[in-house]
Amino acid sequence: MGTLRFFILLFFSVSIVSAQEYSTILWKAQDKLTWKDFRGRVPVPSRAAATTASGFTYKYSAQRIRGELKVSFAVSTYFYPEKSWYNPSLCDSIILSHEQLHFDISELYARKLKKKLDSKTFTHGSLKKEVKFIYNAVMKELNDYQNLYDKETNFSRDLEEQLRWNKKIREALK
């Protein structure tokens, strides 16, 4: 029946904004955030020291070859500078490290999404629905994990826990 090729390109993001509307910083192991990357306005009133807006997007292409659906995925993690902010009077290097780890955790879950998507066999009729289901499940896990991180470190105030989390995530990203 020949090779029927079709390509689907979808972008989803943790953030409400798309990567095309705002500048983004792509996650790279060797690059670390600086306070200059946090360009959003501090909301009034806010008792928080800083907020990191990060997340991941995915895209995929699919081909039907001899009746079999072959799907290829790409997942990327982004930091959104205009949606991230800090209060200079409350921030120090420990808080910056805490915010960096939020970005790193997003990368960790982007990798989990990629692994889950790559290990799944899809059918043409259910591809979009199944991908979205997996994405939503991983997003829930990510949000729960980010909340656990903040809770256990007390938003970076518990230095011992912060150091434990730094090591834990660094090891997970190796």
Q: What is the role of each PLM region?
A:
Residues 70-74, 90:
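Extracytoplasmic
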Residues 21-70, 79-81, 123-174:
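Metalloprotease/metallohydrolase-associated module, dominated by Zn2+-dependent proteases
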Residues 103, 116, 145:
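Short alpha-helical functional segments enriched in proximate histidine and acidic residues
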Residues 115-125:
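Functional transmembrane or membrane-interface alpha-helices that line membrane-embedded catalytic
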Residues 78-113:
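Mid-length scaffold segments of soluble, non-membrane domains
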Residues 17, 113-114:
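A short hydrophobic/aromatic micro-motif that marks alpha-helical segments and, especially, helix-coil
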Residues 1-24:
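Bacterial Sec-dependent N-terminal signal peptides
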